UniProtKB/Swiss-Prot annotation:
Protein's UniProt keywords contain tRNA-binding: no
Organism for this UniProt entry: Schizosaccharomyces pombe (strain 972 / ATCC 24843) (Fission yeast)
Protein name: Presequence protease, mitochondrial
Gene, per the UniProt record: cym1
Subcellular location: Mitochondrion intermembrane space; Mitochondrion matrix
Cofactor(s) required, per the database record: Zn(2+)
Length: 992
């Protein structure tokens, strides 16, 4: 620190500074900087940060700054935006504010900035009662650029009607070039929310919240109900912005090592046109009610789960005002005591007993609303068991109110909190920016919310008699009349009813259209298409240049050594936590057993051992470690995509003092699991498929990409078997088996193969002082297996069959589609890999975004390139017309061979690519690219040089070779049954 550069002058408690971040540490309550008055300062040692809260006196804007030695600095501005109906105004406004502003009138500056920046994070979010716009970057110029774009976008947006029609909703012909085609609803948010109602967990939670919070802003869908979105008028959107997007209603957060003074100066200048305004916002506080409420609704039938066990139900209790940080913390801990882990009382009573397969989406304590809600919910239940479940819930609470909880359980939870504070991710600031606003907007003191140590001290003091949680149960559960019982029953006709409701809505609206209205719709469609097709003049937007990209990598200093007979790498950390990763390569592993590897890995942490129950084992894991993970691994050879290495990956971390215990627990879980415990195996399988369809609906583009890529190489075929729709079908089948004998035989066979397999390797990220204790622990681990360690280097290279069909259509009960087309590229070390990586960014931003999102209305689209796997994948997300999108994929490939890319285009693509490459890596993850994928620093540096040198000719050459004339390409679509004839497709049906 250079204190000589610090210049501070005091004049009537007003501070003037010369651009130095150190001044904020000297600020006191009452000081004034650029119209901002300091109202609070605190040190938060457990998070290693200094907290400063300020008020902008002319407008009353609220700001907090979290000063921390972290170059990945964050900025966010948010506004309280409680919904007033189901039309999705807050959500659509979130989109349209980012479509051009006074200072930056270009269409869609948000997406344009994605490839003019080195941001490590850029996004915007609409919650139930607020909207916020966060970003993060390690580059100071970039930070200022993005801050200016975000501030102008939110406070001075253009809010053009054409942007509203594109992002929100519009009428248009199904084929915009055919006036005889039917008129439909379209729009980005409209299709996004149609995709959301494909998720039964989302439907359950939204219906639950709307019924419970009726009469408050939470009773409306802030994201928008697809049946209500077409009722929204453009003028209402503009009015909502004027009333809500104002500094008086704003909360600003900055985090990291960049100067606070610069932010205050920029904000003060931006806020200059505004004056303080009194706010009149809808009520968000739910008052108590005198008697229990009950509601039954209907939701979709899951094709993966057993039809008779798909009821979701919950009993909810109104709890505290969440602005009370300390009581909120205590209720969060109570929730963990009740629901977390195999030995928790509600898991044992509701799931282990077989009454349900998993907790419902709203289970536990929810503090994201102004009034906290404590819920006990279950999914995978039968309708006949509802009364029994309800009686059991009250019986358990009565028992807990009498007996309380074992102190060991509480200590394990507090240990997890302690270790999580020490385990810092590379995106720690964004994590705070995404979690803090929920309570901040609801009146909580952010300083109290951040001070975890004070919360724990308060908890221990209040629980000194050991009865705090019993008192909370009596107060908020047993003596609480404000109860709400909500149940959602499955309906096989639910998707059909949604489609019929949409058709009815469309018919009602279009039947009222006059000839003049239709002519205006067609005229507007032409205008919108022209605007979308006109190249944007982005000269007004700030940008970084390729020269801002460092030419050399930061070297990862690894030590290579032999530990307990294993080849190992070591990365030095400061004392505190020790991270251990183990990888066991599987050579010539039986093909028939490969799909069962995920089941085996899950079994290791779900069944317990012959001498310890899974509840006891899990308690030890929580008490002594930060967690243990066991999973299958499949990695492509970085010099030959036809080769790959299959394996088992094991990882865990603990406080330095608990490393011996960590490895002991890994040993128990990996080598000594009781695979014959079929009762627990049945529960594990049923839980694994519970809600799995919702996961597909949320990440449908990923499943589509995996499906379409599965026929390209041996490794991509294995990836699909381990984590694609093939695995989903296997889990569904296994979960319905009446006898688990055959499965136990397969799992036992896998363990015997693992016992006889050599080649373990290790990666340790820890303090050098930990070497001896780590070696002793790993020696015990290796001896317990009873096999001599021998390194194997031969890669698996046996032909495997992927998906045989060129085009596969996966029928699922969704409201929108996901499409993907995959082609084979090159291995990581091949020189064509760099231009393919740049090309994927170019086509995403310069062609696919405009053609599929803007014109087609899909929520997302792009071209991804996996440098390790050598796979190019076109994809769409929540798409209304996947067949059209597949044609656009082909058009994009041709366009890439004929379009004259400017140097600006290429430079922007390079910036976008390096956002990912240079994204900060936490200390705990250093060296993992080499450990897992075998990519050395030399390879990384060579790839970096190739990327920086990519030319327009390189791009055209690889586009023609790998996209227009691919050696192999496969296509997949996920979605509802197609109305179109698909004679050349293989139809893959998911049926209950």
């Amino acid at each position: 620190m250079n204190y000589a550069k610090l210049s501070i002058a005091f004049s009537k408690k007003t501070i003037k500074t010369h651009n130095c971040r150190l001044f904020q540490r000297w600020l006191h309550v009452g000081d004034k900087v650029h119209d901002f008055r300091v109202v609070d300062t605190k040190k938060v040692p457990e998070l290693q940060l200094n907290y400063t809260r300020l008020k902008h006196e002319p407008t009353n804007a609220d700001m907090i700054h979290l000063d921390r030695e972290d170059p990945n600095s964050v900025f966010s501005i948010g506004f309280q935006t409680p919904a007033e109906n189901d039309e999705g105004i807050p959500h659509i406004l979130e989109h349209t504010t980012l479509c051009g502003s006074n200072k930056y009138p270009v269409r869609d500056p948000f997406f344009k900035m994605l490839n003019r920046s080195l941001a490590t994070f850029m996004n915007a979010f609409t919650a139930s009662d607020f909207t916020f716009y966060p970003f993060a970057t390690v580059n100071t110029t970039d930070y200022k650029n993005l801050r200016d774009v975000y501030l102008d976008a939110t406070l001075f947006p253009k809010l053009r009607k054409l942007d509203f029609l594109q992002e929100g909703w519009r009428f248009e012909h199904a084929d915009v070039n055919d006036k005889k085609s039917p008129i439909i609803f379209n729009g980005v948010v409209y299709n996004e929310m149609k995709g959301q109602v494909s998720d039964s967990s989302y439907i359950f939670y939204m219906l639950f919240q709307q019924h419970l919070f009726q009469g408050t802003a939470y009773g409306f869908n802030s994201g928008g109900d697809p049946l209500a979105i077409p009722d929204l008028k453009y003028e209402e959107l503009v009015k909502f912005h004027r009333s809500h997007y104002h500094p008086s209603n704003a909360k600003i957060l900055s985090y990291g090592s960049f100067p606070l003074e610069d932010n205050l100066s920029a904000l003060s200048e931006t806020f200059r046109p505004f004056s303080k305004r009194e706010l009149n916002l809808p009520n968000t506080f739910l008052k108590e009610f005198d008697q229990e409420k009950r509601v039954v609704e209907y939701g979709p039938l899951d094709p993966v789960m057993a039809p008779g066990r798909q009821v979701k139900t919950s009993i909810s209790f109104l709890a505290n005002d969440t602005s009370n940080v300390y009581e909120t913390f205590a209720l969060k801990v109570l929730s963990k005591l009740c629901f977390d882990g195999f030995s928790s009382p509600f898991y044992k009573a509701l799931i282990e007993s077989g009454l349900g397969t998993d907790f419902a989406p709203n289970s536990g304590y929810d503090s994201t609303t102004k009034r906290g809600i404590f819920s006990v919910g279950l999914e995978g239940a039968s309708e006949e068991s509802l009364a029994k479940i309800e009686n059991l819930v009250y019986s358990i609470f009565n028992d807990l109110a009498l007996k309380g909880f074992e102190n060991e359980k509480l200590e394990a939870i507090l240990h997890q909190m302690e270790i999580s504070l020490k385990h810092k991710s590379a995106h720690f600031g964004i994590g705070l920016a995404q979690s803090l606003p929920f309570n901040w907007f609801n009146g909580a003191d952010p300083a109290d919310w951040l001070s975890f140590n004070k919360q724990i001290e308060w908890l221990k003091q209040k629980n000194s008699d050991g009865k705090l949680f019993q008192k909370l149960i009596k107060k908020y559960i047993l003596e609480n009349k404000s109860r709400f019982v909500f149940t959602m029953l499955p309906s096989s006709t639910f998707p059909q009813r949604l489609q019929e409701a949409e058709a009815k809505k469309l018919q009602e609206r279009t039947s009222k259209l006059t000839d003049e209205d239709i002519a205006e719709i067609e005229k507007t469609s032409v205008k919108l298409l022209e605007a979308q097709s006109t190249p944007a003049d982005t000269s007004c937007l700030p940008t970084l240049s390729v020269s801002d990209i460092p030419e050399t990598i930061d070297e990862t200093k690894l030590k290579f050594l032999d530990i307990a007979g294993m080849k190992a790498q070591w990365y030095d950390l400061a004392a505190g936590l020790t991270y251990i990763r183990l990888l066991l390569p599987l050579k010539n592993f039986p093909e028939s057993l490969i799909p069962y590897l995920p089941v085996y890995c899950d079994a290791c942490l779900n069944l317990g051992t012959h001498s310890e129950s899974i509840g006891d084992l899990e308690h030890q894991i929580r008490r002594y470690t930060g967690g243990i993970s066991i999973s299958p691994s499949a990695v492509t050879n970085n010099s030959d995509v036809s080769k790959y290495e299959l394996g088992i990956a094991i990882s865990g971390y603990a406080l330095d003092k608990n490393v011996g215990k960590l490895v002991e627990l890994i040993n128990k879980a990996f080598w000594n699991t009781n695979l014959s415990n079929t009762d627990k195996l049945a529960i594990m399988l049923k839980t694994s498929v519970s809600g799995i369809t919702d996961g597909i609906a949320e990440k449908g583009h990923s499943f589509a990409k995996v499906s379409s890529a599965s026929g390209l190489t041996e490794k991509t075929s294995i990836t699909e078997q381990l984590g694609g729709l093939t695995q989903v079908k296997l889990l569904s089948q296994l979960s319905r088996e009446e006898s688990f004998g055959p499965l136990v035989e397969k799992l036992t066979a896998i363990r015997e193969i693992l016992r006889g397999t050599s080649g373990f390797k290790a990666a340790i990220n820890a303090s050098p002082t930990q070497h001896e204790v780590v070696e002793k622990a790993l020696q015990k681990f290796m001896k317990s297996r009873g096999v001599n360690q021998q390194t194997q280097t031969k890669s698996t290279s046996k032909e495997r069959n992927g998906i045989n069909s060129i085009k596969t259509y996966h029928e699922l009960p969704f409201q929108t589609y996901f499409a993907a087309k995959s082609c084979l590229g090159v291995p990581y070390t091949h020189p064509d890999g760099a231009p393919l990586q740049i090309l994927s960014s170019l086509l995403t931003h310069k062609y696919l975004h405009g053609e599929i999102r803007e014109k087609g209305g899909a929520y997302g689209a792009g071209l991804s390139y996996s440098g390790i796997d050598g796979v190019l994948s076109f994809f769409t997300y929540r798409d209304s017309d996947p067949i059209r999108s597949l044609s656009v994929f082909d058009e994009a490939s041709e366009w890439a061979t004929t379009h004259e890319f400017s140097q600006r285009d290429i430079d922007e693509a390079k910036l976008a690519v390096f956002q990912g490459i240079d994204s900060p890596v936490s200390e705990s993850q250093k060296g993992m690219l080499y450990f897992v994928d075998g990519v050395t620093d030399e390879m990384l540096q060579n790839r970096r040089k190739q990327l920086l040198n990519v030319s327009a000719n390189d791009l055209k050459a690889v586009a023609k070779k790998y996209l227009v004339n691919p050696k192999k390409s496969y296509t997949a679509v996920l979605g509802p049954k197609s109305e179109k004839q698909l004679p050349t497709w293989v139809i893959d049906k998911f049926e209950s």
